[in-house]
């Protein structure tokens, strides 16, 4: 997906599309190079790259830490985890609507799958060793990017930063190495893929008509296009994890798994739920019309 997404952003993106496309390309490429070296090393050590066989024979413990770090370097960029997340807001803002949908719905989830299938599956000992690292980076991502999202006026950028926070919950849940945590992470990935993609589509709809993504430009829009506004509100509530929505199920299971493994980490991560509600509700605040809205359902 690297080259197609690079072309989508670079050719059909916004004014800063070239910068954003190359930033996305370089971050992803550099992370993937280390993983390629790790895959070659696994073949040299084990004589195979067949994942099923590697599960059976296992990988020597003395190599696991280095190999885990090499895979981690790739997955951390693709997730993305703090502090290698800075390419994502730029990519989302400059990408066309279709590009943002693909990025949110598919590409970000590949790293979560990789953590479960390869990091936990091939390097179980190293995964336990580096769990504190994952916890630290995940909690920082959840809190810091949520605070940054609170300050955003651009709807696309707000949703992009919220994606980093949501994926922070995913990595946290995976490395609780608890059934509830991992199941919650899988549900969260599916939920985020659907909900964030829908939000980007909703933003694209109004941007095509109004040529603005500023939250303040859409005051009173519910009186003009009520059907669209209700749909947008439903997806926003799902994104903040309202009980009864898919977002709630994923986050709840992740936090349940985290509380079983590390109480302090779970409490800190819970702050992300409160902050998530704050920045998402800023998208659907009630206000008077701020400009002439000449659009309709």
Stretch-by-stretch model annotation:
Residues 285, 289-297:
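Single conserved hydrophobic/aromatic residue that forms the stacking wall/gate
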Residues 3-283, 287:
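Hydrophobic transmembrane alpha-helices and their helix-loop junctions in integral membrane proteins
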């Amino acid at each position: 997906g690297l080259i197609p997404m690079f072309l989508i952003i670079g050719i059909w993106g916004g004014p800063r599309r070239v910068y954003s496309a190359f930033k996305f390309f370089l971050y992803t490429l550099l992370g993937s190079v280390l993983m390629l070296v790790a895959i070659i090393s696994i073949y040299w050590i084990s004589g195979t790259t067949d994942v099923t066989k590697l599960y059976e024979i296992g990988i020597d413990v003395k190599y696991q830490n280095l190999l885990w770090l090499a895979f981690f370097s790739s997955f951390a960029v693709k997730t993305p985890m703090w502090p290698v997340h800075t390419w994502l807001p730029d990519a989302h803002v400059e990408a066309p609507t279709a590009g943002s949908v693909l990025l949110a719905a598919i590409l970000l989830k590949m790293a979560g799958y990789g953590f479960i299938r390869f990091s936990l599956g091939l390097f179980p000992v190293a995964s336990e060793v580096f769990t504190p690292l994952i916890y630290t980076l995940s909690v920082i991502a959840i809190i810091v990017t949520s605070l940054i999202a609170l300050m955003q006026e651009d709807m696309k950028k707000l949703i992009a930063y919220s994606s980093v926070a949501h994926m922070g919950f995913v990595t946290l849940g995976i490395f609780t190495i608890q059934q509830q945590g991992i199941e919650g992470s899988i549900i969260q990935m599916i939920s985020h893929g659907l909900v964030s993609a829908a939000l980007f589509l909703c933003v694209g709809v109004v941007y095509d008509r109004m040529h603005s993504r500023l939250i303040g430009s859409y005051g009173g829009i519910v009186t003009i296009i009520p059907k669209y506004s209700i749909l947008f509100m439903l997806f926003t509530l799902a994104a903040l994890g309202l009980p009864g929505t898919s977002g709630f199920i994923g986050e709840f299971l992740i936090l349940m798994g985290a509380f079983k493994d590390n109480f302090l980490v779970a409490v800190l991560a819970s702050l992300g739920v409160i902050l998530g509600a704050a920045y998402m509700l800023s998208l659907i605040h009630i206000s008077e019309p701020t400009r002439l809205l000449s659009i309709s359902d």
